[in-house]
Amino acid sequence: MAEKFESLMNIHGFDLGSRYMDLKPLGCGGNGLVFSAVDNDCDKRVAIKKIVLTDPQSVKHALREIKIIRRLDHDNIVKVFEILGPSGSQLTDDVGSLTELNSVYIVQEYMETDLANVLEQGPLLEEHARLFMYQLLRGLKYIHSANVLHRDLKPANLFINTEDLVLKIGDFGLARIMDPHYSHKGHLSEGLVTKWYRSPRLLLSPNNYTKAIDMWAAGCIFAEMLTGKTLFAGAHELEQMQLILESIPVVHEEDRQELLSVIPVYIRNDMTEPHKPLTQLLPGISREALDFLEQILTFSPMDRLTAEEALSHPYMSIYSFPTDEPISSHPFHIEDEVDDILLMDETHSHIYNWERYHDCQFSEHDWPIHNNFDIDEVQLDPRALSDVTDEEEVQVDPRKYLDGDREKYLEDPAFDTSYSAEPCWQYPDHHENKYCDLECSHTCNYKTRSPSYLDNLVWRESEVNHYYEPKLIIDLSNWKEQSKDKSDKRGKSKCERNGLVKAQIALEEASQQLAERERGQGFDFDAFIAGTVQLSAQRESADVVDKLNDLNSSVSQLEMKSLISKSVSREKQEKGRANLAQLGALYQPSWESQFVSGGEECFLISQFCCEVRKDEHVEKENTYTSYLDKFFSRKEDSEMLETEPVEEGKRGERGREAGLLSSGGEFLLSRQLESIGTPQFHSPGGSPLKSIQATLTPSAMKSSPQIPHKTYSNILKHLN
């Protein structure tokens, strides 16, 4: 037993001395870890909640929770026995001493189970649900009379003893004081209630709410006890509001206009008749229970029953006894809120000078910097003398904060009678991890800092967004793999684009050099015609002989044109022969003799060379295409030039020399391509593939980069 106790002390950091033994983990509260232990002084099992004090925010939450639970004393609220420091030391009444500690322990009443575990077994009988609902309302009446908002009511925070069927409200880690005599609009924290139990007003105005938010959560819990499942289980705020609008009527026109300005795509002209009323969601319940629930789950908080009014409803008359439903005799007021601010002001500088642990793994950048007080503490009262801009740190629940900032659509309203409740999600990429908010809550961008989620929708394309579809479970690993694959593809395509551009530049330079060389060697026919026209326009003079001599010299130049043309044709024929050799045409050793003897072959080769130059000119004007596409298109043209049948033996020999496609459709390696030394690829059949730059001239091929083709798709397309 001693070894087990020491191991728990080391693993979880519980340091309470030898008084408390047999520690067992129970779960996580609003802002701490909860264990059960046996108190050796009274031999009784208790629940111990450890709150780690690491920064001013945690100190503020601990101060607030301790202040509230010390004053609350009710049969339906979990009792607190004592508050201890490290090693089980007793704390003084001065709560300011917490700033000198690194942790605090709250020893409270141990309960057998919670309502969430009970509902996992199935729905409750209506009589049991009514009994638990009465106790919940009885506790809420006392809490609200003390000017306290719980702000985190859910089945996991309602504890039950199954022997006597007693229900008690616990976990006040997110509770706060709110004096109803002062306005708190704009100075309340956002999104503290678990999403499934948030009221419509809390979804529309996260910074402006009242005690009615606890009543909405109580109504959702009552419906869950009757059905065994969550009443409104939305994946995000938009879907949560959508589910509410399907079942809860919007009676007031001002509420409909507010919804119309925020989410017009889901708003109809008549919202008083929901598509799925509560009678469909809760089949089989009594009429009195349905009427009771409909008066609690109202869209407008002004129409919602308070805890005291709900206890007076006829459905609760079987248990209701006003004289046994006490209220707080010492409620909190605005002074208690201001005292928290002043206390934090006095100890603010001291908190930041806490010594770091020697084995702490946090860097200087990991410690939050707070230059102002918390916005949650400021009220519209002259006694609140602080200008606060920081926001309250929101505690995380495993079922909260399951979505990012992409939550609302600001689309043009589509008013018609056909109301579609299906949301339109355009992005299929998503990842799934049900504990995403515990792992990446600081980067998920879910905890919005705007006055209203639904009023200020911004599609943030520059930031990583983890949710594109309404999912309750997200997979962070899939998202990381998808983002890695996308970055690899982008890098690869960029590299290939750079290589193709270089090849295109080399091809254009080679074509320009060839054109300049042809212009330098040819006969200037335009100059000859211009001189002849100018000479014929002039009158004959005495110096006729000299002009005739000039004319004769021009004629002699014209006669030399045929000789020059022959040399040019010969050069073109040689170039065409080289191109045909590179393109894999049938190479014949007696090329010269065939050109001299066969006039038809000479004409075809000249025509082919002209078509090649024409194709190059067209390609310069059009958009760039892959060099493999050019290669295969020219190969098809060269195959059309074959007019004479070739013997089967010679054809096989020439195919091996040229390195083109064999009859089986496989790529063979030619001697010319081996000399180029291009990188190799592997086809699905296992035969090696090489990048081919046959369209470049020999001079350009020496300087052009050897770049592999990015896929086999273009090659296989030409094969087919």
UniProtKB/Swiss-Prot annotation:
Q: Which UniProt keywords are present, listed alphabetically?
A: ATP-binding, Cell cycle, Cytoplasm, Kinase, Nucleotide-binding, Nucleus, Phosphoprotein, Serine/threonine-protein kinase, Transferase, Ubl conjugation
The ranges of region (Disordered) come to 638-657, 698-720
The sequence motif named FRIEDE motif is recorded at: 332-337
Q: What Gene3D superfamilies does the annotation carry?
A: Phosphorylase Kinase, domain 1, Transferase(Phosphotransferase) domain 1
Q: Residues of crosslink Peptide (Met-Gly) (interchain with G-Cter in ubiquitin)?
A: 1
What would be an example GO MF term here? protein kinase binding
Q: Which cofactor does it need?
A: Mg(2+)
Q: Where is the composition biased (Basic and acidic residues)?
A: 647-657
Which Pfam families is this protein grouped with? Pkinase
Task: Respond yes or no to whether keyword DNA-binding is given for this record.
Answer: no
Q: Give a GO cellular-component term.
A: protein-containing complex
Where are the active-site residues found? 152 (proton acceptor)
In what way is its activity controlled? Activated by phosphorylation at Ser-189.
Q: What does the entry state regarding organ or tissue expression?
A: Highest levels within the nervous system, expressed in different tissues, mostly in skeletal muscle.
Which residues does ATP bind? 26-34, 49
State the signal peptide span.
none
GO biological process entries: intracellular signal transduction; positive regulation of dendritic spine development; protein phosphorylation
InterPro entries, alphabetically? Kinase-like_dom_sf, MAP_kinase, MAPK_ERK3/4, Prot_kinase_dom, Protein_kinase_ATP_BS, Ser/Thr_kinase_AS
> Motif SEG motif: residue span?
189-191
Post-translational modification note: Phosphorylated at Ser-189 by PAK1, PAK2 and PAK3 resulting in catalytic activation. Phosphorylated by MAPKAPK5 at other sites. Ubiquitination at Met-1 leads to degradation by the proteasome pathway.
Give every Protein kinase domain span: 20-316
The record's note on its domains: In contrast to classical MAPKs, the TXY motif within the activation loop is replaced by the SEG motif, whose phosphorylation activates the MAP kinases.
Assembly and interaction partners = Heterodimer with ERK4/MAPK4. Interacts with (via FRIEDE motif) MAPKAPK5. Interacts with UBE3A; this interaction may be indirect and mediated by HERC2, possibly via HERC2 interaction with NEURL4.
Q: This chain belongs to which protein, by name? A: Mitogen-activated protein kinase 6
Organism listed in the record: Rattus norvegicus (Rat)
The opening ranks of the lineage are:
Eukaryota, Metazoa, Chordata, Craniata, Vertebrata
Gene name per UniProt: Mapk6
